[in-house]
């Protein structure tokens, strides 16, 4: 984060636009389009924000939709809504109800997400706690403790869509899955809950498989 530039707050009320730049705190109530990069201490939005460059912040709090064409780098993300990152995402601590859509890799220390997650590349988190409210996917999932479960209260589903998580590879130390489809699941302690379809499970310590799930191959490492 650029600290050599003097920072000022930016407040947007209603519908407006900005070229972007370096700010202290950015607060948007309404709609705002930033034409370039945004570098700030805090972004707080209620409504819709579009950033045509990269977003770099300490804290992000969203209520609504935030679309970033470039990369997102932040220490924390909180709120209710949807964040889209077109050039990858790195946020240390995520706690969100809504959706995260990333083109590229998504890296975090902790992720607590209730909603929808789409990552075209690697989803890497030391602790991942995902509650499915719709179809979710990632190419590869890696981490320490991974928990993927289905919401009990309902689903945001389009006709013909399954409430499931899909990945090519899921790898972690402790893994607990529900309603997940994967080619390979690899880890230490693995619990395959209801509604899963896994081609191969490779485990070091413990493997439990729910009677409603399908695991075609198991390998004790």
Indicate where each model-derived feature is located.
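Extended beta-solenoid/beta-helix repeat architectures
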Residues: 1-221
